[in-house]
């Protein structure tokens, strides 16, 4: 009798994590391969990264089977959570890679990374709301009927208010307003210049517009300064985080209303992303506003990584 496994894949912008679990959800094997976002690395490298992970975990599971006469492994289901895969043609492309390797009959699902993040907090159940606040931000959810809703995720140029990028941008904005004497002084000025190893505010122009380092991440990497200085009593830093909490609440509120979750006796709300999954001023501000308006929300942090969240979705799809 062959051993049945369930595979979850988290295809992020920097790496691809693949996990195999058994029918009880116990982890059997894990592998990390390069980026599988084909918009970033191209189709060939993305396909190779996904195939590498699948082949590795199957091989490792086979190595653990003690029955020398039967080392067969059957993939009961596979679930992929992929960044940059939202359109139908993207999903069909990735599906073709998987079915080429595992066969057309494979039980298969593909979701964007927000859905897998929700599963990481709900142990594989697609019910409730997730708010992701990293470099960008998005809220997504499902009601009991399986209807989905989302808000945000438009990217820094079109929105992402409340995101790490926006917090970093607001730090720069307030530092320069203080320099121009059109806004109050802030302790962010000194710590920002120290972090970037600059001597004066005018140097921020070349830092911000340097074509060699143009990325949303470099703005988001400034966001910890607001957390640190708010903790030390800086009013501007606290204001930035209050604005961020209000923006994140608006995303969550929109999804709750769209899905009618306000009428539920209780629903899970999963926090994930570096800016809110750790306890701190932003998560406290957000939680306070949530509980004032939705006392039926059960605020959760993720209990496993996204690849395990995907594996649990794969497992639950067979139940």
Curated annotation (Swiss-Prot):
Keywords: ATP-binding, Kinase, Nucleotide-binding, Transferase. Its EC number is 2.7.1.59. GO terms for molecular function: ATP binding; N-acetylglucosamine kinase activity. Pfam families: BcrAD_BadFG. Substrate binds at residues 37, 113, 153-155, 160. PANTHER family: N-ACETYL-D-GLUCOSAMINE KINASE. Belongs to the eukaryotic-type N-acetylglucosamine kinase family. This is N-acetyl-D-glucosamine kinase. It comes from Dictyostelium discoideum (Social amoeba).
